[in-house]
Amino acid sequence: MVNKMKWRRTHYSADIKPEMDGQEVIIMGWVHSIRALGKIIFVILRDREGTVQIVAPKQKVGDELFSQIKKLGAEDVIAVKGKVIANEKAPNGFEILPLELEVINTAKRPLPLDPAEKVPAELDTRLENRFLDLRRPKVQAIFKIRSEMLKSVRNTLYNEGFIEVNTPKLVASCTEGGTELFPISYFEREAFLGQSPQLYKQMLMATGLDRVFEIAPIFRAEEHNTRRHLNEATSIDIEMAFADDKDAMDILEKVVYNAFVDVYENRKKEIETLGIEFELPPEKFDRITYDEAIDIANAKGVEISWGEDLSREAEKAIGEEMEGLYFITDWPSEIRPFYTMPDEKNPNICKAFDLMYKDLEISSGAQRIHLYDLLVENIKKKGLNPDGFTYYLEAFKYGMPPHAGWGLGADRFTMVLTQQENIRECVLFPRDRQRLTP
């Protein structure tokens, strides 16, 4: 073991090609597996980009290096200076003949989890040992795809004229009038972890910034314990001025479609590692109204009365009919937040929408109320006190333009892109009702 590395990596495993035959390289990573067959040792080294085979015949590497390699164990951290040897029979068409070995650190054994995946493990065990679980190629593939998605989202929004912002996560009161908040001690006062950047996004529409977005954590003290809910999540939020609900849906379509394309074009290796069938959606998603959605549910035997939110059973029934990505629009005003703009012709419905993937809601948005008096009236209708929203309401007194926006769940969107059934698979260190560590 060493305190200071004497080398620096020259190549990741994926950078090495058979055409580099005879070239000297330095590779670094973990011992994925080791196998000794008499006077020859095979070591599979794993790094972020894949694996590479190191072949050490005793007669070529010498007694000292051979003995050093033989002492290696699973998950030891090593650096190897070696020569590329083209070999059609080897994985990837080449192998590495080691010239020198540096054992950077050793792994305690037995391992609580097998990164080589020879021994399966339950999700709870994997999450308890997430640092080891994340060494598994399939798990890394999920987060490389997630990274690609976030990069794509940012690129699309920048190209559409949006500015990235950061809003407070320590707040004095609730965002949307609910009670699902985590209280914290804030010096001599009580504060809360923010459940949404919603009110701040809207306030920014009064500044002239016009189009803003934020990718940040949100916190909700909901007692759900399902495969699709977490108490800390990452939300992709946008707000756009001089826009309505249709404009917001158009931007959401672009963001989601472009993310699919970028993942498909740039993460083929990860898609293959996950073993999934990855299909691009159409550029335009189907749009059905809330009325049409409950008609589908009722026709399938799931009773939903007008004005009720969609139950889990209703979402499943609608998802079976619609498949893929689709919008549900024109929701009852009663079940949407106070800041949602009602329809001019029928105030019982509002300009809100959800983006669904089969039976999974991945985004929710709306045109917002920009008129001060109507907003105060709506706050009261929801049984809330306008005095609790003073700082927010001030922004609507001095020239607030029409605006719309949405929030897209990054974790759920990753579920869709990687075809995972459990949201915990798509978050590095998930926080749910039971899990606060690691």
Curated annotation (Swiss-Prot):
User: Which positions bind Mg(2+) 3?
Assistant: E361
What GO biological process term is on the record, naming one?
aspartyl-tRNA aminoacylation
Which residues does the annotation say bind L-aspartate? Answer: E176, R220, S364, R368
CDD domains in UniProt: AsxRS_core (cd00776), ND_PkAspRS_like_N (cd04316)
Q: Which UniProt keywords apply?
A: Aminoacyl-tRNA synthetase, ATP-binding, Cytoplasm, Ligase, Magnesium, Metal-binding, Nucleotide-binding, Protein biosynthesis
What does the entry list as the binding residues for ATP?
Answer: R220, A221, E222, R228, H229, L230, E361, G409, A410, D411, R412
EC numbers listed for it are: 6.1.1.23
| Any GO MF annotation of the entry | aspartate-tRNA(Asn) ligase activity
Q: Where is this site: Important for tRNA non-discrimination?
A: P91
| Catalytic activity reported | tRNA(Asx) + L-aspartate + ATP = L-aspartyl-tRNA(Asx) + AMP + diphosphate
Q: Which GO terms describe its cellular component?
A: aminoacyl-tRNA synthetase multienzyme complex; cytosol
- What is the top EC class of this enzyme, as a single word? ligase
Task: State the family it belongs to.
Answer: Belongs to the class-II aminoacyl-tRNA synthetase family. Type 2 subfamily.
Q: Can you name this protein?
A: Aspartate--tRNA(Asp/Asn) ligase
